[in-house]
């Protein structure tokens, strides 16, 4: 069973109850959307691979960079699975050759999606708590709390994806429609919990920036987290709601011309998975409202600085002087 991507046909595609030939506007639109999705996915794979490499091997990690590292891994896995699906559709549309993508990829897609949404929610909620109770947060927080949270979120995502994969027939088991529907409903319920926490976190972070006596200096990490969370709300959550809940209502695919609703939601999910590396580079390159170039490592480091911009510049100068003095 295919839980998210309907099988296209090479020569004829049925849209809104009628068949369209290869030269019809709807088929052309479908091909353009798929090609655009693949291009965005390849850029996203490169960006997330860069973040993974830098955070894993080239930079010292802190509390929040661990979340970013796990988010990059989840986004990379999500883009890998859906790039395979998109390439399959391209081959079918252009060459009339059907290839088989293992059903395991659907389970991997669910795992990556749930893990990515959970990581963004966790980093937003933790940053929110660190701003509300800074002294308690700094004094009582255990050293390996972030690692434990990330492990737990990956474990929960793995459990839900395996249960869904088994009941929906993606793991070589028998398809059970009733259990599959219930598992998808549980996934949607978990997504709604994450959405509620994330929305509250964004609200508090924005209020602390702009309102009254609680106004706080805006740090680059603050901006990075808020932008990443907003992109997830706009581009990421629709994918989960559509493909784990509204999938069971087939009429949902006919609400847009040419049945392009499916491709549109997929395109938004690709944008969400590509957004974090772009946000980090943009936030890291802006200094005093101007773009300043730098190495990828430096830009990523700036994007995760949780200190005001002036203090960050002083810190960079001190580090630079130490590096120069250490050179014989």
UniProtKB/Swiss-Prot annotation:
Q: How does this chain sit within the bilayer?
A: Multi-pass membrane protein
What GO biological process terms are annotated to this protein in UniProt?
G protein-coupled receptor signaling pathway
Q: Which residues are glycosylated?
A: 16
Q: Which GO terms describe its cellular component?
A: plasma membrane
Superkingdom in the source lineage: Eukaryota
The record ties this protein, via PROSITE patterns, to: G_PROTEIN_RECEP_F1_2 (PS50262)
Report disulfide bridges, numbered on this chain.
none
**Subcellular localization, per the record?**
Membrane
**Which ranges does the record list as Cytoplasmic topological domains?**
55-62, 134-144, 200-224, 285-328
Membrane-spanning parts: 34-54, 63-83, 113-133, 145-165, 179-199, 225-245, 264-284
Which Pfam family, just one, is annotated for this protein?
A: 7tm_1
Gene Ontology MF annotations: G protein-coupled receptor activity
The answer to keyword Magnesium applying to this record is: no
Q: Which UniProt keywords apply?
A: G-protein coupled receptor, Glycoprotein, Membrane, Receptor, Transducer, Transmembrane, Transmembrane helix
Question: Which residue ranges are assigned to the Extracellular compartment in the record's topology?
Answer: 1-33, 84-112, 166-178, 246-263
The family annotation for this protein states: Belongs to the G-protein coupled receptor 1 family. Mas subfamily.
As for what it does, the entry says: Orphan receptor. Probably involved in the function of nociceptive neurons. May regulate nociceptor function and/or development, including the sensation or modulation of pain.
Give the protein name, as stated in the record.
Answer: Mas-related G-protein coupled receptor member B8
What is the organism of origin for this protein? Answer: Rattus norvegicus (Rat)
